[in-house]
Amino acid sequence: MNRKVFSFASILLLTFIHLSYTLAQVSATPEKEENSVRIMTYNVRNACDINGVASYQQVADIIHQANPDVVAVQELDSATQRARGVDVLAELGERTMMFTTFVSLYDYQKGKHGLGILSKERPIRHWMVYLPGKDQARGALFAEFKDYIICCTQLSKIQEEQNASVLVIFDAIKDIKKPVFLAGDMNCSYESASQNALQSKFTTLNDFKQATIPVINEPNIPTACIDFIYGYSANYKYAVLARQVISLREFDHYPVFVDVRISSPVDRIFRTKPYLQKPIDNGITISWLTNVPVHSWVEYGKNGNLDQKKQLYVDGQMLCNNKTHHFRLENLEPGVTYSYRVCSREITLYQAYKKEFGYTAYSDIYTFTLPSTGTSDFTALVFNDVHKNFDLMEKFARLIKEKDLKYDFVFYNGDVIDDPKDQDQAVGFMKVLNEIAIAEKAPVFYMRGNHEIRNAYSIGLRSLFDYINGTTYGAFSWGDTRFVMLDCGEDKSDSTWVYYGLNDFNQLRDDQAAFLKKELAGKEFKKATKKILIHHIPIYGNREGGYNPCLEKWGDILADAPFDIAINGHTHRFAYHPKGSAGNNFPVVVGGGPRIEGAYMLVLQKKGKQLIFRALDVEGNEKLKLEL
């Protein structure tokens, strides 16, 4: 009796040790990188070990811990006597919490035998093509997902049928536009004729030098690698980030997986068009975003040429493998029209000693012109408090087109990209704003309102913009006109409970007080023939006794400041305060709000020495006109 107990305990201990070793090996798999897919192929032989004992949970644990996105599964019984009525793929799907796709190749023992796919994502559709197979029916199961298609197969063991199967697979994929992965038990080695044929259209992704079966099972295949994962290379490139074979000696085949980054099609590399910013000091910033990490540059030149190239180096190293791009072109000639385009080459693999690249995207060719010092004419548009109202901006876009309004640059004066939750939301609306402004040709100035300060991505907004001097306030000259832009911060005190002690706008206002003093005393400001002040929250004309820290901090400085006009927003109510009517030393205009019936596009137009201000509603009706 004791001998039996000892024997049973020994078996349990050995089983536990082996299982622990197996799971430890799986748990050592690398974390999947961003923008990659983990593909596994696994001939599970009905989830039975080498002795034919069903091991559903062990197989499921191996798959679950490897955490693949999709698994090509071969040798599956469904409700056969051999499987004791169990639908093997359904059992594995339930235990791994993955979607299942099964096709039957032939009837067997009152059930079915076939191929399957496990996937985290529900397939859009699936289909099967039959392959040559005299010994038993063979086939290829295709499943389409959002970004790729996977084909699961198990080829015949007969070489002639393997070769013929390759041609059938080629025919099945010839019209597919998405990336295609082929995965399965090929029943042949890497050096075989069928493998050579496959490699004419497919890239082998797993390491063919690693055994995928116990060598003893196939003594005629010295490399013992017969399970493969491939990528169809007609329209895509594949970077292998990781690959692994999980050795399980008690099973007929080892699970194999690869982490792959699929190259993006050229038309999906750019996330935004280029947009122009900071047209100051004989330079301009060209910004854009990409969907994938890239190596970027700008091609530009005069007279329609693109004979100059700008790349970015930081401390001697190329600034690349990123998605947000700000290229500063400097030492440009004022008054000269430049052509440019932006270029981004996808980086699919960036390792210490190895780099791989996808395709290169080129934007259309655009133009810009920086003003000369003596430029006296310009037209600028100002929008405020849009609050992500797409319909409103579309109406203004139509108005601009109908009036054939030519302009040089655009201000978005706060509460435009309001309460940004994340980058996707912020960039999504920024794209709309850039489209309205035609920002690839006309520079845009994104100014901060109180709502740009709120929500999780508020601090992230600055990654999208190239602020003058790196601050959300500043000044610049357009020809003989000086623009001064201020940031009023929040509309409540820093101690307000909803800010949780995370704001210090008092300091920001103090910093701007010092900036204002220096700016008003500066040569550029004094020599300008026209001077324009822009900020989001009004300082003048507010409710008496209301919170107005900017007036406290800046009021004395602005009391005698010779601005020709100040343009504000924030209140959602259009207002005009003539000079001196509210303690203001210059005319003040407050733009409207996000509702179509109360929204206005503000137009500043300078011709020679005359500066004209107009406020237009969405129909083009003039709310106010000032000759300044």
Task: Briefly describe each language-model feature range.
Residues 144-151, 162-201, 294-296, 401-409, ...:
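His/acidic metal-ligating clusters that form di-metal
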Residues 2, 21-95, 107-108, 261-264, ...:
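N-terminal, active-site-proximal structural segment of metallo-dependent hydrolase catalytic domains
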Residues 195-222, 226, 325, 543-609:
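Conserved beta-sheet core of the metallophosphoesterase superfamily
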Residues 266-371:
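Short, surface-exposed linear motifs at loops/turns and structural transition points
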Residues 91-96, 113-117, 124-128, 132, ...:
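Extended active-site neighborhood of metal-dependent phosphoesterases/phosphodiesterases
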Residues 25-29, 128-129, 159, 173-181, ...:
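Metal-dependent phosphoester-hydrolase catalytic domains
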Residues 51-52, 76-149, 244-246, 319:
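Structured beta-strand-rich core segments of catalytic domains in phosphoester-bond hydrolases
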Residues 25-54, 62, 292-296, 305, ...:
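N-terminal active-site segment of His-dependent metallophosphoesterases
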